[in-house]
């Protein structure tokens, strides 16, 4: 079969990791896969799997993105994919409009994956218009049924996200060379117990709560150091706000922003505690939680949503 995976970009994130892992699994089982997304750190894994990557920014919120509808329609006619699997809203609209202009026998099966609690709007409703709709957790299934679909919808499937125990083996420890490189890049972490908060730099990910927790612990534990992993532009307003909050709490020297990383397994295994603090809306699926627990690393998380 020929399967298309469509998403915003190949940056580091939950839905992006899911799309790449599906791609790798499909390729390992002999299927043809095409990924349509803007380039990013995960592109190497797509290429390594043997899949094709079309570096089309179909998730960029600008008028020019609509030009990809006709381009994609022509590509579908020429390449005849069997399935189109979309992982985000704007790519879903581009794919849906491209497919809608085709004859029924030329259309691939249109599958959408609900990776989050999208705002209730006609724009977001595209994620519930798939021939098949996938909810990544029971929490997202309930949210989808409440806001988009009737109580009985035969084509809504709950497929829980998971973590490979081969990729995140229990008791795993980073290599000595990794630790040496870590301390060279971040010398303030040497001989410290790392408290780690990974995830996208977004307000609902709980960064302010993490900083407040770190401040409350500093007087009792002098060997802890907070680390925030996540993609953000240097000097962004949100980063500046968090740095200001850390300064007001007197812990600016005990908190490090390490940016986006592809070695998450090593960071988790090197940490004393990992945090998953999504508040409102809650986490759609706790990928960080499953990876962390698979490694056997203690986790602190809110007991709600998809965690």
Predicted features along the sequence, with ranges:
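Short His-centered aromatic/hydrophobic patch
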Residues: 86-92, 114
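N-terminal strand-loop element at the rim of the active site
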Residues: 5-67, 150, 154-156, 234, ...
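A conserved, positively charged/aromatic
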Residues: 104-138, 149-151
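A conserved mid-protein helix/loop that constitutes part of the nucleotide-sugar donor-binding site
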Residues: 16-24, 193, 197, 202-219, ...
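Active-site donor-binding acidic/aromatic loop of nucleotide-activated sugar
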Residues: 234-241, 252-261, 267
